[in-house]
Structure formats: C-alpha cells, structure tokens
C-alpha cells in the first residue's frame, strides 16, 4: 500500500479528519488543493491530529498514478471497494468528517466551498483545544 495501513490504535486519542474523494471529481480537486495549501502544512506536525484522505473506488496503483500528477505531500489511502466510504455515505463527494479525541463526530460536510472549508479549519482548531 502507498502509505501503509492505519489501525484504530493509530487514531486513538487523536483528532481525525476523514476526507473522501475521487480522482475524477472536480470539487474534490479544489478541496484537495486547499488541503495541500493550507490544512496539511498547518497540522502535519501535530501529533494530536491525523488526516485520512481516502480515494473512493481507487486502488493503490490508481492513487500513485494520480499523485504523480498532483504531487500532494499528504498521504492518500485506497478504498477500491467503497468499504470505508459505505460506512459514511452511499453517494456524493467530497465529504469530510471530523472526529474529536474521544472519537465523537464533531463536524461533517458534503461538497466543497471556500466558506465551508474555513468552517472545517475552525472545527479542527476547536477540537484540538
């Protein structure tokens, strides 16, 4: 796998952002560009935060090829059979789910807009306090 496996133990006690996307989704591309530009640089060194960007219907090979073009510095995780996606939704991307350190869902969004992304950043800050 491109970035290894993530286990529940890896996430315990951390603020976790699950971002679901597809390589062919226009709004997803805008959101991921913003993740690369603002969100990831701000939080990549924070040991209390985990970012899980999950490619719906994509394999490791798909994501490697995609990231050769995009050059994202954050990890991309495959979900070729929609196993993770199906835990959250049955359609519509991008989707973002933010969980606090206790594992409680504290923010969710479907679709992308700059305003919504700012709300997400505020929710992350609040969850990390």
Predicted regions and their residues:
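Short pre-active-site segment immediately N-terminal to redox-active cysteine/selenocysteine motifs
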Residues: 14-16, 21-24, 92
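Short, internal strand/loop/helix patches
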Residues: 52, 64-102
């Amino acid at each position: 796998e491109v970035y290894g496996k993530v286990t529940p133990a890896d996430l315990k006690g951390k603020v976790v952002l699950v971002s679901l996307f597809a390589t062919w989704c226009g709004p997803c591309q805008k959101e991921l560009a913003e993740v690369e530009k603002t969100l990831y640089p701000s939080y990549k060194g924070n040991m209390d935060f985990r970012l899980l960007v999950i490619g719906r219907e994509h394999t490791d090979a798909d994501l490697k090829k995609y990231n050769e073009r995009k050059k994202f510095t954050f990890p991309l995780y495959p979900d070729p059979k929609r196993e993770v996606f199906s835990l959250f939704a049955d359609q519509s991307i991008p989707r973002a789910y933010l969980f606090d350190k206790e594992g409680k869902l504290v923010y969710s969004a479907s679709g992308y807009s700059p305003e919504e992304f700012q709300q997400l950043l505020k929710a992350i800050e609040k969850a990390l306090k």
